Amino acid sequence: MSQINIVENKPALLIDIRLDNKLSKILVISDLHVGSTYWSQNNDIALDWYHITSEIESELSDMAISNKVDSIVLLGDIKNNIFKVVKDDWNLIPKLLHSLSAICQVYLIPGNHDSKIGLVTPENIHLMGVKGMVLGDILFTHGHTFPSELRSNINKIIMGHIHPTFFRENSVLNGQKIWVFLKVKKDAIFPSSKGSLEIVMLPSYNKYVYGNHRMKIKRTNSPILKKILRKDIIEKCLIVSIDGTILGNENLLGEVFNSSL
């Protein structure tokens, strides 16, 4: 069994999970998008990625140390350039990963932006497959691939990829990052299984990567979303702000995804 908690005012999770008869604490983040020239160009902002990456490194190190975590799980899209490793990646990513690995074990699950990420990943980082990994009863995955039926023994999916964002005109929360917590019918993902499956969708950790009306999420961005965003599949839903305020239930999903249920 596992216990999942959000980090107050941060798009990060702390998970207590029993592994090999020992309680382990895991810090989970997603979607750093280091060197995000695409995002900066579309928002007309000049960004200093050396400063931003140092800021992320400092924040994650402080969280890992203060919470005495045993490991950090990075849920993908560490870099932003989809097709290649660019100069900023060579300069920034190894330093970030090396710094975190000096504190605890680090697991990196590649996302759709992480092609050739192995070229800039230090040897002491646990580089996993794109399908993710299982710890205890949880599947950790980026969210751009569909889970294998072989993973059907899990009870929870923790994923990134979609950058969940709240959209409502004239709302103070319009364009703000949010958490999405779902309980769905398990057979929507694992047809041979009965019961329920919990799914947690992480916001992007990078505070400069955010949503606007031009980037509204489509359910087809993730094969997992495509299967579960239906009224007859969703059993329970909580939409939660970064500070932990509950904003609503499944009735607000239309404010997050570019379609109604």
Q: Predicted regions: what is each one?
A:
Residues 1-261:
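Extended recognition/assembly regions associated with phosphoester-bond processing machinery
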